[in-house]
Curated annotation (Swiss-Prot):
Residues 528-622 are annotated as: Type DYW motif. This is Pentatricopeptide repeat-containing protein At5g06540. The lineage of its organism: Eukaryota, Viridiplantae, Streptophyta, Embryophyta, Tracheophyta. It comes from Arabidopsis thaliana. Keywords: Repeat. GO terms for biological process: RNA modification. One of its GO terms (molecular function) is zinc ion binding.
Amino acid sequence: MSNIVLNTLRFKHPKLALLQSCSSFSDLKIIHGFLLRTHLISDVFVASRLLALCVDDSTFNKPTNLLGYAYGIFSQIQNPNLFVFNLLIRCFSTGAEPSKAFGFYTQMLKSRIWPDNITFPFLIKASSEMECVLVGEQTHSQIVRFGFQNDVYVENSLVHMYANCGFIAAAGRIFGQMGFRDVVSWTSMVAGYCKCGMVENAREMFDEMPHRNLFTWSIMINGYAKNNCFEKAIDLFEFMKREGVVANETVMVSVISSCAHLGALEFGERAYEYVVKSHMTVNLILGTALVDMFWRCGDIEKAIHVFEGLPETDSLSWSSIIKGLAVHGHAHKAMHYFSQMISLGFIPRDVTFTAVLSACSHGGLVEKGLEIYENMKKDHGIEPRLEHYGCIVDMLGRAGKLAEAENFILKMHVKPNAPILGALLGACKIYKNTEVAERVGNMLIKVKPEHSGYYVLLSNIYACAGQWDKIESLRDMMKEKLVKKPPGWSLIEIDGKINKFTMGDDQKHPEMGKIRRKWEEILGKIRLIGYKGNTGDAFFDVDEEEKESSIHMHSEKLAIAYGMMKTKPGTTIRIVKNLRVCEDCHTVTKLISEVYGRELIVRDRNRFHHFRNGVCSCRDYW
């Protein structure tokens, strides 16, 4: 339709001019009604412009039923053209039902309307969203049939689709055959390698790129974070800043999450300062990441401060602060935040209840915990999951209600997993209940036969009861199943640098000689106040002298010695480790906090331990 005819239509029907200023779904429906009454909907040009408003993401906030409404408009168009079909294919390719985009493509071909280079990128997008390479390959054959295989936009879509579906070799072949590669082509390959876990290949391609944009940096940093290369994610962010590239909220979420996993508080604080100084919009995702990072790095007070200052919150951000308070041992404060969350109208999710029940467990709030567990389904319609069952078992076990905990496990609607059984076995050790421990331990070894920690825990329970023949049987079972203990490691951040110490690999650190001498000094001081090595958690197939030597080389002891060496007196020492703290290390850390007057914060696999003046926040139950 010519501009003259369009202007004539606008002159005769002034409401058509409102199409460009439509600002809400209500406006759209009013204009739609006008077009129906005036029969202008029968004009394909006018109808297509109305349809375009439905699919344009920048026009107004879209209701959930928008796709259905768009299809209703489409059904009123008598002779839809290629522009209309492309709009619908685009709309559905990025929606909840991307497969429906192919229905419009089939209808388009039946109407003898042929696709163009706009059609295929959206069809490829749909197959990528479906993560169905078979549909993608069929679309690829259609691309070749209609001669668009050398179009750069189509090629970029194919590279992205194959990479997103995990077919990185196919993506690489198309990339290699491209006559022209733009930043999108390169970034799609980087993203594909990251998704397949091939971060070294991704970095190699990233470094080869002639030009990079912010999205490329974001993809590579996020790729490192998603593949547990947290230090590399932080290093690349530092390199990005040196290159003069300004980060956005997406980049900072990846960086801050990496700090959280490493327990890198110093760098996390610098990242937070960067967010503030850059005047970034602290949206829900970034805000929750900041809260999560601070409590995971051991600074629960800063986490509370950031949470209280968030411009907006949702159920996930509330769940994060509640979980943080729970693992730091602030049960009553966690319950206060949970009550506040409910009173403000936020709907708790399953992760919220995991956090709240964990708080009840750590705080010994048995009756309250059972009440919340019962109300979870009754008042909020949330079915219990393994995580919730685990919290209840842990809570009952901590309270010494071992029979109730075992009975709860037997009545569960699902098969118990290793963490649930492990929680009860740990309680059996604390309360020296060999009878329940044997039943639970045998179940546990069947569920997780390769986990060395459960054998050691059960053997310690037998040792306390003097049942040496059963210890011998466990030792034989471990040898038969080739069970090996995973290497323990501990991280400590000094001057913004992460230092990693690994059990049995103590010669890698360049200052290991000084560290060992510092540890001997610490050992001498804590022995003066009665310390004797507790070898209970050491493997039971070595002699006592070897056990004594091995426990003094545990990774957290080396990390603590290094921290004492490198920081001023009175400085808080923060350690992150991958395994549960053993009894000897727990005792040693309490004594160090008493002798040296320092606070030590240790994050292990289960929780945070705050050591002050010879006392731990876990109250010796972990």
